[in-house]
From Swiss-Prot:
The lineage of its organism: Bacteria, Pseudomonadati, Pseudomonadota, Gammaproteobacteria, Vibrionales. Keywords: Acetylation, ATP-binding, Ligase, Magnesium, Metal-binding, Nucleotide-binding. Pfam families: ACAS_N, AMP-binding, AMP-binding_C. This is Acetyl-coenzyme A synthetase. Transmembrane segments: none annotated. It comes from Vibrio cholerae serotype O1 (strain ATCC 39315 / El Tor Inaba N16961).
Length: 649
């Protein structure tokens, strides 16, 4: 193999694995040569009410983007995640909840989860929620968040989860776009010892005059904090479920019925509602969970993601539960109340598989041995990384320090849009290279293309595309199929463009090099530069703004904002704080710029287009080769920006 550090497959993993290297190669070849045959067989990993006979109907052709899988089959997601396990493991733990406060925890068995989900599903029906209605979930990381998701799927309602860190404005935008009928929230959330005012944010969001369809708000009592109450609109969760029956037959859903909408940032400002459907998504989440994490019966799996992100959907709730796993739902943050909290949780619950983000790993790495103080982490068998590419130094630290050099790391590459993991090692099959996502999962056909769309072979770099569909692929942008085609299929005709660049080495391993479009990846959260720019320009003292990402040791990317102010407004420490607070309010803390670079003018072409390529280079200090600046309306702007950058503290 080509790279300096190679970690061969561990013999103890290989001895009891779902797929060794020979199995991987044989299955992968079949999945590419005969996708119909492959998915016809592996589609049976979930239980169907009416078995499918049609497997794959997909087209990436311009003007005919159409993705359908298992389309004549019917099933229910909640029945696959709960009911099918009741006879064999009804008394086994399904969800382990670990509170923000280390003294708080609880478990739900599959039987208890079934009861809770049925009751809440009936409570939703009582409030008029019907099959096909959209329900917005804005919840803390408590078991009821998973219960709410599963209750929606039980009755055929479509959920759209909004991360609890988003502001009222961002929440309102998602409620409006999805046409949600009901909101599920809590009085407050708790995170890192602080209360998060969820109900207050919902109340503010619903004041937006464009929010027209919300008839009810279901409120979970999490902290008992004071909240405003709207008598005919708001309902306490505990009161609604107290009188609900715990018998709720699962709704029979078509494979292509919508399952959920999840908003993700685009480069054009307005967030995109990624639509996933029932059959293909569940097959893919179930299959990837089983093989990527090499899940064995009775193991404890901990995905540290929030349910508000796709990782929480696929690998905290649906993938684990469909496989009958024990899944941990963690309310807190990895370094509270102690730096070693993540390791403490691993020991406390004897976690076998840990799936976390490079951001968390880098933050803990900065603390050295404090991150593992007083812990052994002996239970760990497999570790994973998700959200952004992991740099080799962080990979090595994670492997050595957290994993005691005995747990292989699955460095997984995928997106909200893909529904599940696309490029990844398999623990019993793949020799590891720190920093490489390695090889494609079954049925996934990656390719690298140059900027003209020509496929480039061998060891090379290029734009990462996918040549054919897989069951977990998003079907459309909610309410805007043209935008779906425009965003993902117009750059390179007949291919799905991921928006990422990648390098392929001589062993065929993929190394993700990051976004090639104007989307930032901050702490594993994707945000469009346009969304942040829009928020900045909406501030009454700002004339213009341009946002770029710069490398950051902990977060992966930091947000660097170039700002021109209105006439008569001058930079000050006070304005600096005002601008940051404004973005926090408009979008959320995650979008707060790390650097504000005040300037008089931005580099623009004569047609008025901002030259972001130049801004990126200046922000990262890479000014030796700025490329062609002849198209700039005023080339002197560049020298001014470089001088200003040098003055920034």
């Amino acid at each position: 193999m080509s790279e300096a550090h190679i970690y061969p497959v561990k013999q103890n993993i290989k001895a009891h694995t779902h797929a060794d290297n020979d199995t991987y190669l044989a299955m992968y070849q079949q999945s590419i040569k005969d996708p119909e045959g492959f998915w016809s067989e592996h589609g049976k990993i979930v239980d169907w009410i009416k078995p499918f006979t049609k497997v794959k109907h997909t087209s990436f052709d311009p003007g005919h983007i159409d993705i359908r899988w298992f389309e004549d089959g019917t099933l229910n997601v909640s029945a696959n995640c709960i009911d099918r396990h009741l006879a064999t493991r009804g008394d086994q733990v399904a969800i382990i909840w670990e509170g923000d406060d280390p003294t708080q925890d609880k478990t739900l068995t599959y039987k208890q989860l079934h009861q809770e989900v049925c009751r809440f599903a009936n409570a939703l029906k009582e409030q008029g929620v019907r099959k096909g209605d959209v329900v917005c979930i804005y919840m803390p990381m408590v078991p009821e968040a998973a219960v709410a998701m599963l209750a929606c799927t039980r009755i055929g309602a479509v959920h759209t989860i909004v991360f609890g860190g988003f502001s009222p404005e961002a929440l309102a935008g998602r409620i409006i776009d999805s046409n949600a009928k009901l909101v599920i929230t809590a009085d407050e959330g708790v995170r890192g010892g602080r209360a998060v005012p969820l109900k207050k944010n919902v109340d503010e969001a619903l004041c937006n005059p464009e929010v027209k369809n919300i008839s009810k708000v279901m409120v979970l009592k999490r902290t008992g904090g004071n909240v405003a109450w709207h008598e005919h609109r708001d309902i306490w969760w505990h009161e609604a479920t107290a009188k609900a029956s715990d018998n709720c037959p699962p709704e029979e859903m078509k494979a292509e019925d919508p399952l959920f909408i999840l908003y993700t940032s685009g480069s054009t400002g307005k967030p995109k509602g990624v639509l996933h459907t029932t059959g293909g998504y569940l097959v893919y989440a179930t299959m990837t969970f089983k093989y990527v994490f090499d899940y064995q019966p009775n193991e404890v799996f901990w995905c540290t993601a929030d349910v508000g992100w796709i990782t929480g959907h696929s690998y905290l709730v649906y993938g684990p539960l469909a496989n009958g796993a024990k899944t941990i739902l963690f309310e807190g943050v990895p370094n509270y109340p102690t730096t070693a909290r993540m390791s403490e949780v691993v020991d406390k619950h004897k976690v076998n598989i840990l799936y976390t983000a490079p951001t968390a790993i880098r933050a803990l790495m900065a603390k050295g041995d404090e991150a593992i103080k007083g812990t052994s982490r002996d239970s760990l068998r497999i570790m994973g990384s998700v959200g952004e590419p992991i740099n080799p130094e962080a990979w090595e630290w994670y492997y050595r320090t957290i994993g005691n050099e005995k747990s292989p790391i699955v460095d997984t590459w995928w997106q909200t849009e893909t529904g599940g993991i696309l490029i990844t090692p398999l623990p019993g099959a793949t020799a590891l290279k720190p920093g490489s996502a390695t090889r494609p999962f079954f049925g996934v056909q990656p390719a690298l293309v140059d900027n003209m769309g020509e496929i480039v072979e061998g060891a090379t770099e290029g734009n990462l595309v996918l040549l054919d569909s897989w069951p977990g692929q998003m079907r459309t942008v909610y309410g805007d199929h043209d935008r779906f085609e425009q965003t993902y299929f117009s750059t390179f005709k007949g291919m799905y463009f991921t928006g990422d660049g990648a390098r392929r080495d001589e062993d065929g391993y993929y190394w993700i090099t990051g976004r090639v479009d104007d989307v930032l990846n901050v702490s594993g959260h994707r945000m469009g530069t346009a969304e942040i720019e829009s928020a900045l320009v909406a501030f009454n003292k700002i004339a213009e703004a341009a946002v770029v990402g710069v490398p950051h040791d902990i977060k992966g990317q930091a947000i660097y904002a170039y700002i021109t102010l209105n006439d008569g407004v001058y930079p000050s420490a006070e304005l600096h704080k005002e601008v940051k607070d404004w973005v926090r309010k408009e979008i959320g803390a995650i979008a707060t710029p790390d650097v504000l670079h005040w300037t008089d003018a931005l580099p623009k072409t004569r047609s008025g287009k901002i030259m972001r390529r130049i801004l990126r280079k200046i922000a990262t200090g890479d000014t030796s080769n700025l490329g062609d600046t002849s198209t700039l309306a005023d080339p002197s702007v560049v020298d001014r920006l470089i001088a200003e950058k040098a003055q920034l503290k």
